[in-house]
């Protein structure tokens, strides 16, 4: 699976949110293919690798600011809107609503003459309590789910489809992989586990996909995607407990049967963590909205993307091995305490 270099060579492309996990991998692949890339992002850290990637043009701005969005998109043939706020707790919840609603409207106005690849999420596809696998045509049944990330991503998708422009919507799974410069939510979970801080498995399950393959899938969506259509760009469906087994194997630890937290205990932990966060100002982990997500199995299939785009992700075990190697190279701290005894080889 690879994008067509002839399609991208010399093409002017804007990547909104190009310093985030997915956006960064899209930018890297575009540069490797010879694209002329402009990135719109909030000020990145001084050590972010975007500073060393030539010949990327970095525009500092905010999706909520229409002028900076117009500047970033001006003259570009293709626009990837990978800018988003991913949060299940705290002050970022209000920001998320502004970015996903007002920011999407700003992008649609500025990209009226370009092909827009709108990055959504599998959360807009839906989930079940039974593990049923869903696709792009499955009815959405979580309209009453009180999770702001799900609600605002659905709103953004509805705005995109209502615009009747040259837009392709992608629905990536939960992203895993190396080269995670700003440490995504899934990346933080992996690091927390490899540091011995996840002794039991949360309930629920996810579709987990390699960020590198999903980035390639976005390029293929720009090349071959049908206007007005959604494409799930996923990987493998696993319970969280099974995912932890894969993380353990990548670290060379002996496999363990992880106890799965019952829902009531997960909710009690979330209540306690949110109460503590009011005093410490630190992230509530888990939060109540995060606990609501973990009531479900977010299982999907990518058959349409495979058929129409040529999307073909690698096995998840290879992804996790690469991810662990990257974290070790970044100085991942060793196990400690009781988890060192529990997980030792």
Regions found by a protein language model. Give the residues of each.
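Conserved Rossmann-fold NAD(P)-dependent oxidoreductase catalytic core, especially the SDR/UDP-sugar
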Residues: 99-150
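Substrate-positioning beta->alpha
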Residues: 155, 185, 202-222, 228-229
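A conserved pocket-lining segment of Rossmann-fold NAD(P)-dependent short-chain dehydrogenase/reductase
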Residues: 142-144, 188-209, 213
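Mid/C-terminal beta-alpha module of Rossmann-like enzyme folds, strongest
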Residues: 217-285, 302, 307, 318-327, ...
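Conserved catalytic-site region of short-chain dehydrogenase/reductase
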Residues: 88, 122-132, 175-179, 184
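Conserved beta-loop-beta element that borders a ligand/cofactor-binding pocket
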Residues: 120, 158-178
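NAD(P)H-binding glycine-rich loop region in Rossmannoid oxidoreductase-like domains
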Residues: 46, 54-102, 110
């Amino acid at each position: 699976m690879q994008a067509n270099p002839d399609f991208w060579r010399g093409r002017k492309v804007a990547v909104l949110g190009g310093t985030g996990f997915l956006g960064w991998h899209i930018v890297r692949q575009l540069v490797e293919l010879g694209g002329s890339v402009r990135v719109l992002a909030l000020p990145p850290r001084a050590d972010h690798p975007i500073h060393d990637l030539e010949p990327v043009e970095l525009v500092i701005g905010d999706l909520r600011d229409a002028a900076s969005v117009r500047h970033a998109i001006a003259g570009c043939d293709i626009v990837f809107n990978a800018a988003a706020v991913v949060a299940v707790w705290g002050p970022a919840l209000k920001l998320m609503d502004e970015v996903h609603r007002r920011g999407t409207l700003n992008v649609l106005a500025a990209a009226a003459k370009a092909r827009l690849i709108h990055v959504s999420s599998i959360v807009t596809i839906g989930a079940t309590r039974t593990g049923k696998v869903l696709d792009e045509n499955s009815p959405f049944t979580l309209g009453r789910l009180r999770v702001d990330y799900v609600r605002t991503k659905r709103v953004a998708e509805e705005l995109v489809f209502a615009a009747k422009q040259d837009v392709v919507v992608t629905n990536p799974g939960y992203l895993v992989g190396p080269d995670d410069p700003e440490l995504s939510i899934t990346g933080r979970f992996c690091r927390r586990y490899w540091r011995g801080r996840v002794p039991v498995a949360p309930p629920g399950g996810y579709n987990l996909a390699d960020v590198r393959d999903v980035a390639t899938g976005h390029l293929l969506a720009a090349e071959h995607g049908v206007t007005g259509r959604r494409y799930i760009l996923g990987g493998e469906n696993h319970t969280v407990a099974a995912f932890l087994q894969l993380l353990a194997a990548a670290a060379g630890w002996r496999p363990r049967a992880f106890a799965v937290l019952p829902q009531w205990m997960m909710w009690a932990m979330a209540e306690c963590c949110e109460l503590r966060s009011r005093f410490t100002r630190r992230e509530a982990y888990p939060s109540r909205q995060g606990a609501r997500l973990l009531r479900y199995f977010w299982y999907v299939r990518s058959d349409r993307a495979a058929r129409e785009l040529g999307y073909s992700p690698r096995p998840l075990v290879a992804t996790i091995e690469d991810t662990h190697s990257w974290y070790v190279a970044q100085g991942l701290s060793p196990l400690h305490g009781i988890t060192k005894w529990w997980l030792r080889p």
